[in-house]
Regions:
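Short, charged low-complexity intrinsically disordered segments located at boundaries
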Residues: 46-51, 63-69, 108, 124-126, ...
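Short, functionally critical alpha-helical segments immediately adjacent to catalytic or ligand/cofactor-binding
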Residues: 1, 35-38, 124-133
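Non-catalytic, conformational "gating/processing" segments within enzyme and secreted inhibitor domains
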Residues: 1-104
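Flexible, low-complexity segments enriched for small/polar residues
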Residues: 83, 87, 91-118, 126-182
Length: 182
């Protein structure tokens, strides 16, 4: 694990939580990153287990996204989740994964409100998403799911294989997935 201790906080972790996993780019400041990093000091892992070392935690006063106090990592996460932009960002990621890339900003706000109003519970959100007109619209069909041939070829590429089986074998493989080529 990287260094993440009082006096040497790991700003990368704080930045990645906000940028990649919760809020997206531009919804926080460099000051917020530094303060969040301080709040996460003492957080680490050993193997696959979370470890908190209170002696390595910066328990001083912090200000993060307008919240002041002796904040720790849980406080930072709670503050991030309280931001409407977080729900909108996560709703957008889920929509783009399950439906299609093109997402109207007004719909993203509405989906974010739904996610947030349900305490970030995924089941009610997914039920709404999977039963939505957008999910079943012709322009959404097959935009996120690979067909059997595309799936087989991309699997070979990801495995680093240079040769794809000949027609009979490849047709048998894709046929088992529901799409015969020949």
């Amino acid at each position: 694990a990287g260094v993440n201790v009082k006096g040497a906080p790991n700003e990368n972790f704080a930045r990645e939580i906000m940028e990649l996993f919760s809020m997206g780019v531009g919804n926080y400041t460099e000051h917020d990153i530094r303060e969040a990093a301080r709040a996460f000091t003492g957080w680490n892992f050993e193997g696959l287990e979370f470890r908190f070392n209170a002696a390595q935690h910066d328990d001083g006063e912090k200000e993060f996204l307008g919240r002041r106090g002796r904040l720790d990592g849980v406080d930072v996460i709670d503050t991030i989740l309280a931001q409407p932009v977080t729900a909108e960002y996560l709703a957008g990621k889920l929509y783009r994964y399950f439906v299609r890339e093109d997402l109207d900003p007004a719909l993203q706000r509405k989906l974010g409100e739904l996610l947030r109003s349900n305490g970030y519970r995924i089941a009610p959100f997914m039920e709404t998403l999977l039963l939505s007109r957008d999910f079943h619209a012709p322009e959404s069909v097959a935009t996120r799911i690979k067909g059997p041939v595309e799936q087989a070829v991309s699997t070979y590429k990801k495995m680093g294989l240079r040769e794809i089986p000949g027609a009979p074998d490849f047709n048998e493989l894709t046929g088992a997935l529901g799409q015969k080529l020949l």
